[in-house]
Amino acid sequence: MKTKALRLYGKEDLRLEEFELPEIKDDEILAKVVSDSICMSSYKAAMQGEDHKRVPNDVAEHPVIIGHEFCGELVQVGSKWADEFQAGEKFSIQPALNYKGTLDAPGYSFQYIGGDATYIVIPN
């Protein structure tokens, strides 16, 4: 599926691009973004690029989708989540979500999930 997204490539380097999302894995979910809020945290990430604590150092080679305050609708659910979620259900992303021991978070750190996109892949 194609998505259109605002992607960060580095300091003050944002690009609106259309590209193909990968097929979802069994532990992922394809979703449509309905609304995204912009805030100073996104601005800070765009200005600082790879110097931002949540933006990966290799962002120039692996751009990330900006936007961490968003909601939408589930489109396709991987088999791992089929008993919990269904296509058509609404979702929202907790904006400070990250795993213990890492600062990686949607809207800062990942290639296929961020609020400034039409469609995204929600990872496990």
What do the predicted segments below correspond to?
Residues 104-118:
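Short, compositionally biased
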Residues 7-13:
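Extracellular beta-rich ligand/substrate-recognition surface
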Residues 122-123:
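Short helix- or helix-capping micro-motifs
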Residues 13-20:
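Short glycine/threonine/proline-enriched tight-turn/helix- or strand-capping micro-motif at secondary-structure
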Residues 22-36, 51-100, 114:
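Glycine-rich beta-strand-centered segment in the early N-terminal region that forms part
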